[in-house]
């Protein structure tokens, strides 16, 4: 199965979310492109556990979107919009990666195959 060839650099093989992402990318992209995107997604996920990062993806309308995101609960608590009803991260997978958007102060997601890149110079 092609998915196995994508491999794992940082996380354990039992990470269900990354397994789904690997399969989705292997089924939708050439192997080299899938491996590069997967590597960035895996690194983003690990950074966002306790930090924040900057990344770029292509929106549905074709525009590039710069995003600053996290999944760290302490950072989310400091940045979430207190005037609005709290939203929650949706665990369902449909080819997307969810993150807390630090500029919009709410949960957002993007399709994993639209990731343009991860800014490794901006990792907090």
Where are these regions (language model features)?
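Acidic, aromatic-enriched beta-alpha/helix-loop junctions
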Residues: 70-106
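Short, compact, well-ordered microdomains
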Residues: 94-124
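Single-stranded nucleic acid-binding surfaces, predominantly the OB-fold ssDNA-binding core
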Residues: 69-70, 111
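A short, Trp-centered hydrophobic/proline-enriched beta-strand micro-motif
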Residues: 49-57
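Short basic/aromatic-enriched segments
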Residues: 65
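Mixed-charge, Lys/Arg-rich low-complexity intrinsically disordered regions
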Residues: 24-44
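Eukaryotic low-complexity, non-globular regulatory regions
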Residues: 2-24
